[in-house]
Amino acid sequence: MKKIGFFIMNIGSAGGTERVSINVANALAKQGYDVSFISIGGNKPFFQVDEKINIYAMNKLPYSLKKDYFSITKKLRELVKELQLDTLIVVDGAIMLFSALALVNLNIKHILWEHYSFNFTGNRLVRTLGKYLAVTTCDKIVTLTEAEKTLWQEKFKTNNIISIANPNTLLPKNKLAKLENKTILSVGHLFSYKGFDYLLKVWQVLAKKYPDWNLKIVGSGEEEENLKNLAKALDIEDSVNFIPRTNDVSFYYESSSIYCLPSQTEGLPLVVIEAMAFGLPIVAFNCSPGVKQLVEHKENGFLCEQNNIEEMVKGLDLLINNPELYLQMSDKSRLMSEDYGIEKIIEEWKGIL
């Protein structure tokens, strides 16, 4: 069977990119593929990895391109040759800088799996260079949505791009979300681009009107202290629960009522797909083509103008006050989530390996 390698920034991170990469790798391993992870940082995965999958960690995070570029590239090349890989899947365009050189003159299929939106501005220079390297060196570029695929094609005039959605493997076992839980949920790294400061300002308006409701934010990150201080300054700390990153996110989906996504940028957010599977209506900022694909306005939730606090308040308020509307949107979320089942998505991956 084919030997597949996933080259990833940090296998130990608890983000959606890591979770979905592990989900796909696990599914391939279960179907007989010989799968390995090569990680620049971390050697202990946060999410469960199939026992048949090998993990090779360089322990190079944080790295400096000036100091570490050639050592990381050299190590990657050595591992690719040692493992006799047929295909290397690069998870995130920011690390294309290493794989583009590491695979020179090696007869290996080279695939970029881009999880970030085409217009994401973080680490701009590295990501721009990564795009050009992907177009010139990769056999395939995988985007998460058709809209992102179109953006790549319009910019680079290339036909080696395919869209494959993120698959969901997290399904409800016992119970679904319900309005009576009186909980608004948001899950993600506590980073500035996740927009949790906007969510707290939204909640400040709603908390006064619905004192028996609460907001749960599940995740860890560098903005945690700032967000807790903001909650205190907004006088909402008693109704906001900050919960550290966890493997048992299912518990929070099934015990909540509405999922809220205040992000400034996203790819195709796995947390939204998972929330939909548990019957959570979604209220989100329209921050990317991926979010627009998942949230059909007034069907399974509300798509709000970017950073428009008033619109987000209105969407949440409508769901809280209308049990019939809530049930309609909850059912629609569950139905739409079925398009992202792992069985369907993994066949698309097998088609390009």
UniProtKB/Swiss-Prot annotation:
E.C. designation(s): 2.4.-.-
Record bears the keyword Phosphoprotein: no
Subcellular location: Membrane
Mode of membrane association: Single-pass membrane protein
Record protein name field: Uncharacterized glycosyltransferase HI_1698
Principal location listed in the UniProt entry: membrane
Protein keywords: Glycosyltransferase, Membrane, Transferase, Transmembrane, Transmembrane helix
UniProt similarity note: Belongs to the glycosyltransferase group 1 family. Glycosyltransferase 4 subfamily.
Recorded GO MF terms: glycosyltransferase activity
Disulphide-bridged cysteine pairs: none
Annotated TM spans: 267-287
Domain of life: Bacteria
Species per Swiss-Prot/TrEMBL record: Haemophilus influenzae (strain ATCC 51907 / DSM 11121 / KW20 / Rd)
Gene Ontology biological process terms from the UniProt entry: carbohydrate derivative metabolic process
Record CDD domains: GT4_AmsD-like (cd03820)
InterPro entries, A to Z: Glyco_trans_1, Glyco_trans_4-like_N
Example of a GO cellular component annotation carried by this entry: membrane
